[in-house]
Amino acid sequence: MRSATYTFTTVVPAPVERVFQVLTDPHTMAQWLPAARAVEAVPPLKKGSRLRVVYDTREAEIEVVDFNQPSVFGWSERSGRRSWRTFFRLEFAGASTRLTVQVVWQAPSLIAWLKVKLKQSRNITGQMDVMIQNLRLALEK
């Protein structure tokens, strides 16, 4: 089945190291991850680490599948939305960070793919925008 890839790039007014720290610290992840109430993991994170994310309406287990400090962080959902992967690429931009967020979804069926593409509540780009706004707020703390 075909995959859907969503990419969002922006500049965040903080150094790469600080952005990477906020993205990868389980204690701050619930601040920027949309609808997350809690994130449970044993820090520090590394490739292969597993995290439990408690959202408003569901729970998910995610596994870190890409970790290259301070430039790359990525995970794959192991429970909940099993076919979703999220990646963050951080690049030096002076005193700021160029941040690219990519969400990749491997649709299990044509019907599932159509639901995600057509259903307003599955507004992936809107969720990515909320994630970035939340991250900006978390960086101000």
Task: List each language-model region with its residue ranges.
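Hydrophobic pocket/interface hotspot
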Residues: 19-23, 29, 51, 64, ...
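Short, surface-exposed coil-to-beta transition loops
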Residues: 5-7, 58-62, 82-87
